[in-house]
């Protein structure tokens, strides 16, 4: 029968349906960063007081009930004997999709920050790019100047001027057989990775992806219904791909191979002879090549970046790049992909790309408008990656500082702004690298990404972003050394 209940009655009923006790609500509040104590919950349950709006919202979210129902909605009668509310689960397509670069460790860091704790972040490239490095003035000026003309949609593949500039950049990289219709702009490379995987993979199709990888590749391949098969990059060989491992993992279901060059998270740069070996394997097994080259302008030590597409005019290649890293405009969301080589063998796939490109209408038009200026003007990033430049000097410092810590070793990166140190797991008795990252965060307030977040199979690595100034990196390395002096898992 219908009966009017107090707030306390409704709260207790909702707790019973969720099989939650007062202590469970307290733990949930701690996790969510909501300031509510044991005495508060006790008073709500006993009916001595009712919560303020913020706490009411937290309770309704935690208990999966409507906030208006929980508050009584002005005293309206509520029937507690009706069937439980319908709940909505995530799609089963996401069951095997992981993106731990922004996962539990980051959630814990966010909770700590909400509670007033300062976190030393040597993880977030996007935040650090914005806070530490300036976007070139001419890029900002151009966006402001053209903003009034960027209010409508562009062609789905992008503005002509932007694609023309990208095509000319592809020519400088010696990428063969590229015209204006082979260029697609996107809201960052991330959108285009998702689009390219969705257009290619059917259930059961396999795609070779490096380990360690940037996890979006694995996530997008899995979400598209494919199977990511990880080939090993060998730490003992400058993190270059292990060719024998690639050969072992190719089979009749393999459709493509992915390269990340320069590499995130290792900072490796693949020389021409390594790329040629991959081309030879792709040619033998008739594979498509996807090459993520977003860091191609962040190469140090006088090394040259070679685009693998320039070595494979007879294969179908898709090359990805953008302005987020080289021009410090991650928030502008502008990337591109370039189709090259033998496009005749991929006509149907290209039709799928066009369909998906049309479905999202177009990418960010104001950001497209600055591509021509960004690619054609002074490349200010060059000043950062030479001796005396900030990125160069910060790499030198963090590499030496990490290698000086007992139990830590690292391969010196040649490009990008990442280093992927190895931990002596026997020395520190580490069996769970995510727990290591959480313990470091809670003890020393340092945020890193654990190696398994990059689909690395062993719990013995972590990634550091060396974009902060040397004094910040020094503080972080001292705290890490202190932590490892006593840490045992």
Language model regions located:
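Recognition helix of helix-turn-helix/homeodomain-like DNA-binding domains
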Residues: 31-51, 72-73
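N-terminal small-domain helix-loop-helix segment of the aminotransferase-like
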Residues: 95-188, 195, 362, 374-377, ...
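A short, Lys/Arg-rich alpha-helix, primarily the initiator
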Residues: 1-27
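Conserved core segment of the aminotransferase class I/II
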Residues: 310-389, 399-401, 484
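Conserved core of the PLP fold type I
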Residues: 146-280, 297-310, 478-479
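PLP-dependent enzyme catalytic core of the Aspartate aminotransferase-like
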Residues: 172, 429-431, 439-448, 454-489
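Short, basic-rich loop-to-helix N-cap that marks the start of a DNA-contacting helix
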Residues: 46-61, 77
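Conserved glycine-rich beta-strand-loop-beta hairpin in the small C-terminal domain of fold type I
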Residues: 372, 388-402, 410-424
């Amino acid at each position: 029968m219908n009966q009017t209940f107090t707030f306390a009655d409704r709260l207790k009923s909702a707790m019973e349906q969720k099989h939650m006790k007062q202590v469970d609500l307290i733990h949930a509040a701690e996790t969510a960063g909501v300031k509510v104590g044991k005495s508060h919950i006790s008073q709500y349950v006993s009916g001595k007081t009712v919560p303020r709006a913020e706490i009411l919202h937290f309770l309704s979210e935690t208990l999966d009930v409507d906030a208006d129902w929980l508050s009584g909605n002005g005293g309206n009668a509520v029937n507690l004997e009706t069937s439980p509310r319908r709940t909505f689960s995530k799609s089963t397509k996401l069951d095997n999709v992981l993106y731990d670069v922004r996962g539990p460790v980051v959630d814990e860091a966010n909770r700590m920050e909400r509670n007033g704790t300062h976190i030393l972040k040597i993880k977030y490239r996007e935040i650090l790019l914005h806070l530490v490095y300036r976007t070139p003035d001419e890029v900002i000026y151009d966006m402001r100047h053209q903003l009034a003309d960027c209010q409508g949609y562009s062609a789905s593949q992008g503005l002509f001027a932007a694609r023309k500039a990208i095509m000319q950049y592809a020519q400088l990289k010696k990428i063969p057989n590229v015209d204006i219709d082979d260029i697609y702009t996107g809201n960052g490379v991330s959108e285009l990775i998702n689009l390219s995987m969705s257009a290619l993979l059917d259930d059961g199709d396999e795609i070779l992806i490096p380990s360690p990888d940037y996890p979006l590749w694995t996530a997008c391949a899995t979400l598209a219904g494919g199977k990511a098969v990880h080939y090993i990059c060998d730490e003992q060989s400058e993190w270059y791909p292990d060719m024998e491992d690639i050969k072992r993992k190719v089979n009749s279901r393999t459709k493509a191979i992915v390269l990340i060059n320069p590499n995130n998270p290792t900072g490796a740069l693949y020389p021409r002879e390594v790329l040629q070996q991959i081309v030879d394997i792709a040619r033998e097994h008739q594979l498509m090549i996807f090459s993520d080259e977003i860091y191609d302008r962040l190469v140090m030590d006088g090394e040259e970046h070679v685009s693998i597409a320039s070595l494979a005019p007879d294969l179908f290649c898709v090359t990805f790049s953008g302005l987020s890293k080289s021009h410090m405009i991650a928030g502008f969301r502008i990337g591109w992909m370039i189709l090259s080589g033998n496009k005749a063998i991929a006509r149907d796939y290209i039709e799928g790309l066009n369909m998906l490109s049309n479905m999202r209408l177009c990418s960010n038009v104001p950001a497209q408008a600055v591509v021509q200026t960004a690619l054609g003007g002074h490349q200010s990033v060059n000043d950062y990656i030479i001796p005396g430049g900030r990125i160069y000097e910060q790499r030198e410092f963090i590499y030496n500082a990490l290698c000086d810590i007992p139990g830590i070793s690292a391969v010196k990166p040649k490009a990008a702004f990442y280093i992927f140190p190895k931990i002596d797991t026997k020395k520190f008795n580490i069996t769970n690298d995510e727990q290591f990252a959480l313990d470091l965060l809670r003890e020393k307030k340092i945020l890193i990404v654990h190696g398994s977040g990059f689909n690395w199979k062993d719990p013995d690595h972590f990634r550091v972003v060396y974009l902060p100034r040397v004094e910040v990196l020094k503080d972080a390395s001292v705290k890490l050394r202190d932590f490892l002096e006593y840490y045992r898992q």
